[in-house]
């Protein structure tokens, strides 16, 4: 099990990403657009740097909802492979069953 502080940190990052998403996207569009004057683009870069570091989506880490485990995470279920297996064996995930051939 992951420490509660690490889970809380991920939740905080998710909130920051959602809060600054539109602002970050608009600044990145300005930075990429070659038709905009260089000075204005440079100002956009400086504004982007002033945003909180944790507001960047790449700082987030996918974690299991139950355990907080960062590795072997299955996006479709939001769980780690072990918790998916346990839930499948109990029949809690509709349409998912153990393979046999």
Swiss-Prot record:
InterPro entries: Ribosomal_uS14, Ribosomal_uS14_bac/plastid, Ribosomal_uS14_CS. Disulfide bonds: none annotated. Gene3D superfamilies: 1.10.287.1480. One of its GO terms (biological process) is translation. It comes from the Bacteria. One of its GO terms (molecular function) is structural constituent of ribosome. GO terms for cellular component: cytoplasm; small ribosomal subunit. Keywords: Ribonucleoprotein, Ribosomal protein, RNA-binding, rRNA-binding. Pfam families: Ribosomal_S14. Belongs to the universal ribosomal protein uS14 family. Binds 16S rRNA, required for the assembly of 30S particles and may also be responsible for determining the conformation of the 16S rRNA at the A site. Part of the 30S ribosomal subunit. Contacts proteins S3 and S10. This is Small ribosomal subunit protein uS14.
